[in-house]
């Protein structure tokens, strides 16, 4: 019946278990991977036949987190999981990126990978587990796949690399790096860091790749025991005669077209050449497949660009290999936003804004690993007009979510701590033109917009996208790649950071054989490019503005006695609601007695502070206050003495002679001097008019607690 095959191995501080043959036996392959109570069930289904006319590889990766994995019921209205969250989308991309290049060229059968998180230990992130599961399932499936891959997370604590750190360890770590690769080569890196050096980052990549070899070995052993027979798939034979005929018609013309430096002009010319070539060939032989001709033309394009770069000739737009496109940097471009910048690099342009809000604007993320609050939001929008196309405009696609997260990682390391700058900050990058490296333009624009908004970031940051063309032992690293160089090259390598170090590194490698030395050259060349861009940015704005925008809320902070919090909030929030309406401010109170008052108008903030100080003022026994009669009863009168405090003047304490009727001496609303005789344990205040009038000292207002005020 059920006959599971299991492999267990130690991976750093965790025990990993791979199990197959137990569940989902109708899928092409299925694996349950667990790492110290975090378990992910991964299935792979591949279609044996490709759809007719299919001209691209339809790989789909779905990653889904089930709340039952953490012993919870979904909080949504329907109490079930809905569309993928941003976190799920990012992990799906993390799985997709290293496995996609390992399918053979020409393989266009549909393949779907589904990773479902079924159990979660809050200390062990499921992303690495899911990547290992996808690698194992694809390797077991028999589908043409040049894997397996391994995956590792690397931390950097006390100047030491840590393999697969726990969530608690990650809080202490200066690095959060995920690396995936085959036995021979690194394929993907995704990381954020606290401005670490190039050597430290490269060391982490190499360390992670070395450590994950045990994963690859164990997957290979599992495949020997339980793997399905390899599919009998053969790449279609190359039609040499047809290739030569297409090259004769188009190669020289395409070579000339790729000397046109303007992107739109070049694309138009390339389209003309392709359509004329296909039309001429189909006229000669009607049986020819237009898709096949298109693929041959694409291969010729790729060869034209690559051979020119390898020969040391100028690039598509006429630049040398390490040249950056022309930069145009402007700040304060939108009058009413809190901070704005327009960053243009060649034909790539980002309009970036920064908006300041209060702590209640922070995003609450209800994640499988636990609830957390994010006070720095980064949103990236890529409208179709940025590449001169029409298209759907709506909720962000996977690519936009991924690029937004990368840009956020680039800026996160320089953001001020919440206790020093108590604002929620939202950065939005609108890509208005795109020809390569728009996510890195977003990093540069974000740094400028944050400075323009007066956010005290620790340093300016810039980002750069690098490319690589490699044939045999000959390789060239390209700085600031164009969109075409990204598609036609062998590596996409994005680095963001300040003058002092790297804040984010993302690598996607399409070929094997990228050595440590090549990565070192790319990182060093990226550093030079980054410093050049920072130099240009500093000419526009070299430090955060001294003050935040007049349109941004100013946050004033005062400290009150924690015992007085209930007085400021009032029954059912009545006092704080009334204060908010009366003063036109936003008031937030923390458990330690910190009160934050946010207002766009300084006078309103001062009014709110004054009112809170009145409410929280301590009443001093023996002190005389000016009061107002609020209620008259048979046995005396209640007098308000400021700050919402009220005390009783007993009938015997109204005058130094016998008082028959209170109203003979006091009227509602009458202002009278009163002396505090006693405050009992329940906070009730006894007052005396008689003793106050006997003493000649002037009346005092309630004394307020010391207030610390910052903006």
Curated annotation (Swiss-Prot):
Catalytic activity: RNA(n+1) + phosphate = RNA(n) + a ribonucleoside 5'-diphosphate
Phylogenetic placement of the source organism: Bacteria, Pseudomonadati, Pseudomonadota, Gammaproteobacteria, Enterobacterales
Top enzyme class: transferase
Protein name (Swiss-Prot/TrEMBL): Polyribonucleotide nucleotidyltransferase
Keywords, ordered alphabetically: Cytoplasm, Magnesium, Metal-binding, Nucleotidyltransferase, RNA-binding, Transferase
GO CC aspect terms: cytosol
Binding-site residues for Mg(2+), renumbered to this chain: 486, 492
Function description: Involved in mRNA degradation. Catalyzes the phosphorolysis of single-stranded polyribonucleotides processively in the 3'- to 5'-direction.
Cross-referenced SUPFAM superfamilies: Eukaryotic type KH-domain (KH-domain type I) (SSF54791), Nucleic acid-binding proteins (SSF50249), Polynucleotide phosphorylase/guanosine pentaphosphate synthase (PNPase/GPSI), domain 3 (SSF46915), Ribonuclease PH domain 2-like (SSF55666), Ribosomal protein S5 domain 2-like (SSF54211)
Native source organism of the sequence: Citrobacter koseri (strain ATCC BAA-895 / CDC 4225-83 / SGSC4696)
Keyword RNA-binding attached: yes
Keyword RNA-binding: yes
Positions of the KH domain: 553-612
Compositional bias of kind Low complexity: 694-711
């Amino acid at each position: 019946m059920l006959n599971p095959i299991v492999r267990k191995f130690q991976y750093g501080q965790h025990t990993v278990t791979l199990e197959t043959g137990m569940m989902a036996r109708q899928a092409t392959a299925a694996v349950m991977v667990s790492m110290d109570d975090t378990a992910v069930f991964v299935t792979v289904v591949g279609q044996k036949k490709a759809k007719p006319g299919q001209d691209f590889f339809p790989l789909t990766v779905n990653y889904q987190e089930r709340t039952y994995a953490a012993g919870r019921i979904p909080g949504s209205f329907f109490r079930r999981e809905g569309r993928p969250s941003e976190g799920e989308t990012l992990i799906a991309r993390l799985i997709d990126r290293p496995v996609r290049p390992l399918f053979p060229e020409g393989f266009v059968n549909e393949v779907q990978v589904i990773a479902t998180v079924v159990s979660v230990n809050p200390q062990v992130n499921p992303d690495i587990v899911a990547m290992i599961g996808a690698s194992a399932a694809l390797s077991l499936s028999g589908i043409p796949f040049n894997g397996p891959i391994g995956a590792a997370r690397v931390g950097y604590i006390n100047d030491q690399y840590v393999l697969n750190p726990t969530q608690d360890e990650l809080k202490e770590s200066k690095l959060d790096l995920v690396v995936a690769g085959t036995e021979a080569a690194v394929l993907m890196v995704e990381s954020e860091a606290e401005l670490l050096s190039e050597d430290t980052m490269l060391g982490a990549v190499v360390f992670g790749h070395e450590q994950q070899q045990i994963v690859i070995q164990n997957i290979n052993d599992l495949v020997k025991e339980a793997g399905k027979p390899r599919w009998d798939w053969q790449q279609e034979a190359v039609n040499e005669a047809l290739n030569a005929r297409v090259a004769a018609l188009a190669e020289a013309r395409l070579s000339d077209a790729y000397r046109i430096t303007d992107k739109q002009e070049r694309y138009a010319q390339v389209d003309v050449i392709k359509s004329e070539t296909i039309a001429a060939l189909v006229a000669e032989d009607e049986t020819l497949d237009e898709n096949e001709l298109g693929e041959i033309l694409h291969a010729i394009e790729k060869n034209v660009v690559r051979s020119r770069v390898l020969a040391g000739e100028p690039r598509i737009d006429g630049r040398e290999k390490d040249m950056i496109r022309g930069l145009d940097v402007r700040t304060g471009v939108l009058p009413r936003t809190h901070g704005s910048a327009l960053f243009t690099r060649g034909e790539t342009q980002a309009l970036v804004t920064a908006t300041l809000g209060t702590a209640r604007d922070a995003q609450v993320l209800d994640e499988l690993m636990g609830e957390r609050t994010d006070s720095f939001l980064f949103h990236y929008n890529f409208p179709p007009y940025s590449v001169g196309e029409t298209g759907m405009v709506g909720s962000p696609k996977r690519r936009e979510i991924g690029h937004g997260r990368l840009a956020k990682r680039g800026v996160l390391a320089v953001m001020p701590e919440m206790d020093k700058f108590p604002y929620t900050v939202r950065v939005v990058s609108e890509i208005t033109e795109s020809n390569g490296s728009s996510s890195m333009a977003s990093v540069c624009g974000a740094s400028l917009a944050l400075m323009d908004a007066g956010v005290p970031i620790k340093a300016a940051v810039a980002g750069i996208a690098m490319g690589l063309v490699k044939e045999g032992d000959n390789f060239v690293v390209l700085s600031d790649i164009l969109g075409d160089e990204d598609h036609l090259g062998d590596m996409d390598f994005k680095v963001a950071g300040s003058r002092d170090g790297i804040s984010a590194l993302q690598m996607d490698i399409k070929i094997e054989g990228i050595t440590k030395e090549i990565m070192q050259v790319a990182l060093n060349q990226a550093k030079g490019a980054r410093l050049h861009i920072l130099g240009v940015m500093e000419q526009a704005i070299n430090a955060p503005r001294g003050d935040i925008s007049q349109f941004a809320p100013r946050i004033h902070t005062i400290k009150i006695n924690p015992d007085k919090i209930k007085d400021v909030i009032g029954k059912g929030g009545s006092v704080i609601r009334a204060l908010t309406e009366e003063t036109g401010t936003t008031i937030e109170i923390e458990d330690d007695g910190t009160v934050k008052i946010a207002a766009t108008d300084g006078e309103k903030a001062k009014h709110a502070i004054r009112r809170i100080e009145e409410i929280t003022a301590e009443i001093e026994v023996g002190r005389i206050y000016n009061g107002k009669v609020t209620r008259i009863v048979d046995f005396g009168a209640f007098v308000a003495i400021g700050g919402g405090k009220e005390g009783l003047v007993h009938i015997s304490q109204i005058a130094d002679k016998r008082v028959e009727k209170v109203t003979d001496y006091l009227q509602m609303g009458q202002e009278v001097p009163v002396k505090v005789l006693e405050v009992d344990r329940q906070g009730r205040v006894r007052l005396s008019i008689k003793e106050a009038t006997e003493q000649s000292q002037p009346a005092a207002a309630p004394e307020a607690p010391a207030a610390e005020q910052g903006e």
